[in-house]
């Protein structure tokens, strides 16, 4: 069995990826995938200009798959089941992360200073805050029915 949680969004060549995943499975092996999706439109995360901070700092090189995108790559893995979940729960999660980082600002700043350096920690603290707010807004949009969470179960 293979389980992937929120990783496939950072990939683009799904045909090659699914072939590789299939090669790791025994015959009859299962692959469970949890991903974020847009209801109908896949789109790439590519930096378009200096203001495109989410593509640059959080999803560089990745893509937002559409809900049906994984179904087009069944050469090596066959879909057994698919589930779609409202984005409302992820909206709640992103808002909880925002509250948590605000309540633990000193601890967060310490970690961010270690990772990004003292000169960049404040900037990264704000980037993370805006990221959480943006995610909450996206996944809550249209009552959670535009950007969603999708689960897929494939079999080799």
Each model region followed by its residue ranges:
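Residues at alpha-helix caps and immediate loop-helix transition turns in enzyme cores, especially N-
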Residues: 13-14, 93
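A short glycine-rich, Lys/Arg-flanked "PGG" loop and its adjoining helix->strand segment in the class I
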Residues: 15-30
